[in-house]
């Protein structure tokens, strides 16, 4: 079966933004104009096509990235047909993992900003993630019809807050109630959309006199940005004083793909203006799978050996599983992005991370919550596979005879935990199945059993994250559960180096005994460096075969620190000396010696408690700014700055310990009469002050 759309005409894009910037509405309009949906789905009435989980429709926020395929020929039908695979990403900070996951498999992104709210906290997080994966992007300023809308202020904020380099390719005609359309700076014509046709029809007209000067100024800015793409274009611009439409597009495209600039557009998705021009910009400026560097990976048999795969049907098959979903009708769906080669239903592929073969049952392409079965998918495609038994998010599927491991995604450690128990005994087993299924879908969500209390503990990225998990258990698996109070995920570490600490495990009372003896040096590592074990044994004083058991013992000891039993992080253990007994030594004896030795060393090395610090940003009317700052300080918060917001009001940034933030939403509402909002995301671990640490230790001792 031949390819229907040439790969050069593919665009794999994500639409990402802060909550309420109108991202889902923007995606809806895209699906409407590209002919997928016939009645526009509004988030206002809980009917948007991409928000297909029940909780999303209730809460009006997008949680899971739905992947949708659609086609576009340009708003005036002047382009050959292009195929868009659109991933709608969530805008709530508790779901950062979803954004990170989609950034990994996208080729380009459309960042949606609110013309009133401007650049908000989540916009910064998403921008950082897009930088990390070097994703070329466009910016779309939405809600131009709202009171307080200001396009140029958002342009400034992208420069100052995000350190971006925005280049408007349209400018608005009017704003607020007066927003009529945009000036296309390439054609130097006004575009006015016809409201009766829901924006399906439009006309080019002359630029209104009141925006002529603004349009000329910004056109000059755009042409200069395009000219900087190459010496040839710069010389042409200097000689002729301008550039042709083709040259401008080519220059802007080259610089967008190099992540040097971000073409910027505006409109109002809700009123059906501007999204159509943004779709043309996706074709003009965002990359196809062949415009990005070949995907790189390693050989499963030799981590040092680097491999690459071209975005080509003729290459050996490789794909990344970037999302798992449980579907009520077909069971487990595994979303994959194909980087090279062809995958047909019935094929056997190799999970190169786990070293297992998998058979592809069926392949479906998603039109939001409608699915179309296909026989095969090719390089550049995004689709869902049915029938994979043991594939987790972030794993690579490849050709059986030519395996490759693509760059793994790194998922953050959870910062908040809660005990959860089923309301009835009958639900006990169902709860276990539900939680393990949810954990395989979402790597930032963990499940474990507390050894002392026997309780099931769930951990995640924030209160909302865990709330939604419990909610999904109820809806999708019919498991009713009681949830305990949220617990902070503290950690322990050490602050000083101790040398020559003995760890001994000796049991010798007739018959075969036990003998293990190790000597450690324990030292702190810089934050975030993790655990390191160094074997410095000389002359076989601890035999080779026992060294892995020593490391295993240390790793086991790390799970429970000496102060309050929290996991120990950021330490280096050097095994420097030891002794053994010809008959009585065993792996078990050395493992026990290592556990005792590590605990002893940790007690002497000035152990401390670490607590998770959160980056908190509060947006509040100016009158309440003082109260909000005072309250953050009383929560042991460090206020780091205050910015003016586009539509008035203040954005206050602070770093606050997570333990002080429980119940903050209610407190903030009452302090500001419900007029302030806040977002919070994990920043790093920091040493807890002595009085706080003592209280934590005392609470654990009870």
From Swiss-Prot:
GTP binds at residues 17-24, 88-92, 142-145. GO terms for molecular function: GTP binding; GTPase activity; guanosine tetraphosphate binding; translation elongation factor activity. Disulfide bonds: none annotated. One of its GO terms (cellular component) is cytoplasm. Residues 8-290 form the tr-type G domain. Keywords: Cytoplasm, Elongation factor, GTP-binding, Nucleotide-binding, Protein biosynthesis. GO terms for biological process: ribosome disassembly. SMART domains: EFG_C, EFG_IV. It holds the Pfam family EFG_C. It is found in: Cytoplasm. InterPro entries: EFG_II, EFG_III, EFG_III/V, EFG_IV, EFG_V, EFG_V-like, EFTu-like_2, G_TR_CS. Belongs to the TRAFAC class translation factor GTPase superfamily. Classic translation factor GTPase family. EF-G/EF-2 subfamily. Catalyzes the GTP-dependent ribosomal translocation step during translation elongation. During this step, the ribosome changes from the pre-translocational (PRE) to the post-translocational (POST) state as the newly formed A-site-bound peptidyl-tRNA and P-site-bound deacylated tRNA move to the P and E sites, respectively. Catalyzes the coordinated movement of the two tRNA molecules, the mRNA and conformational changes in the ribosome. This is Elongation factor G. The gene is fusA.
């Amino acid at each position: 079966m031949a390819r229907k759309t040439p790969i050069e005409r593919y665009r794999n894009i994500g639409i990402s933004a802060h909550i309420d910037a109108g991202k889902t509405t923007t995606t809806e309009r895209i699906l409407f104009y590209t002919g997928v949906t016939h009645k526009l789905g509004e988030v206002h009435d809980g009917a948007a096509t991409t928000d297909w989980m029940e909780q999303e429709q209730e809460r009006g926020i997008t949680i899971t990235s739905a992947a949708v395929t659609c086609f576009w020929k340009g708003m005036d039908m002047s382009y050959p047909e292009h195929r868009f695979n659109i991933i709608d990403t969530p805008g709530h900070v508790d779901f950062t993992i979803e954004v990170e996951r989609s950034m990994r498999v996208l080729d380009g992104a459309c960042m949606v900003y609110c013309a009133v709210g401007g650049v908000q906290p989540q916009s910064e997080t998403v921008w950082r993630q897009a930088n990390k994966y070097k994703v070329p992007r466009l910016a779309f300023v939405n809600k131009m019809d709202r009171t307080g809308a200001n396009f140029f202020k958002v342009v400034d904020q992208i420069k100052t807050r995000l350190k971006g380099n925005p280049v408007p390719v349209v400018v608005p005609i009017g704003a607020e109630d007066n927003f009529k359309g945009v000036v296309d700076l390439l054609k130097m014509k006004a575009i006015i959309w016809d409201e009766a046709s829901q924006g399906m029809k439009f006309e080019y007209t002359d630029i209104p006199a009141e925006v002529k000067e603004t349009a000329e100024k910004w056109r000059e800015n755009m042409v200069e940005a395009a000219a900087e793409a190459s010496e040839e274009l710069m010389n042409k611009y200097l000689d002729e004083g301008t550039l042709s439409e083709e040259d401008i597009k080519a220059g802007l495209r080259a610089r967008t793909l190099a992540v040097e600039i971000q073409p910027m557009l505006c409109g109002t998705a809700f009123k059906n203006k501007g999204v159509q021009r943004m779709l043309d910009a996706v074709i003009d400026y965002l990359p196809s799978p062949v415009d990005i560097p070949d995907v790189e990976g390693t050989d499963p048999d030799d981590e040092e050996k680097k491999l690459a795969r071209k975005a080509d049907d003729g290459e050996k098959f490789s794909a990344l599983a970037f999302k798992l979903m449980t579907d009520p009708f077909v069971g487990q769906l595994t979303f994959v992005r194909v980087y090279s080669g062809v995958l047909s239903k019935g094929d056997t592929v190799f999970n190169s991370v786990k070293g297992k073969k998998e058979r592809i049952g069926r392949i479906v392409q998603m039109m939001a919550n409608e699915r179309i079965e296909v026989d095969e998918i090719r390089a550049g495609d995004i689709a869902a596979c049915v029938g994979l038994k043991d594939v987790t998010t972030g794993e690579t599927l490849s050709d059986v005879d030519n395996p490759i491991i693509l760059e793994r995604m790194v998922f953050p450690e959870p910062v908040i935990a809660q005990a959860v128990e089923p309301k009835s005994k009958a639900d006990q087993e169902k709860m276990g199945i539900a939680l393990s299924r949810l954990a395989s879908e979402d790597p930032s969500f963990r499940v474990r059993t507390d050894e002392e209390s026997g309780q099931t503990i769930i951990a995640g990225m924030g209160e909302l994250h865990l709330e939604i998990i419990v909610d999904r258990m109820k809806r999708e698996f019919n498991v009713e559960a009681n949830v305990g109070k949220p617990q902070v995920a503290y950690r322990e570490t050490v602050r000083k180096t101790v040398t020559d600490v003995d760890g001994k495990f000796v049991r010798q009372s007739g018959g075969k005994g036990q003998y293990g003896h190790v000597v450690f040096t324990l030292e702190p590592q810089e934050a975030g460096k993790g655990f390191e074990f160094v074997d410095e044994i000389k002359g076989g004083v601890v035999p080779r075969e026992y060294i892995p058991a020593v490391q295993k013992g240390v790793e086991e000891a790390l799970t429970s620190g000496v102060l309050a039993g929290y996991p120990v992080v950021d330490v280096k253990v050097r095994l420097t000396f030891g002794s053994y007994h010809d008959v009585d030594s065993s792996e078990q004896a050395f493992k026990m010696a290592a556990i005792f030795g590590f605990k002893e060393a940790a007690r002497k090395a000035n152990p401390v408690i670490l607590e998770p610090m959160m980056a908190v940003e509060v947006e509040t009317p100016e009158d309440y700014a003082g109260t909000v700052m005072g309250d953050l300080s009383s929560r042991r918060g460090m206020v780091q700055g205050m910015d003016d917001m586009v539509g008035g009001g203040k954005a206050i940034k602070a770093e606050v310990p997570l333990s002080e933030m429980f119940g903050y939403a209610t407190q903030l509402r009452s302090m500001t009469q419900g007029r302030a909002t806040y977002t919070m995301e994990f920043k790093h671990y920091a040493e807890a002050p002595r009085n706080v640490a003592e209280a934590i230790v005392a609470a654990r001792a009870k």
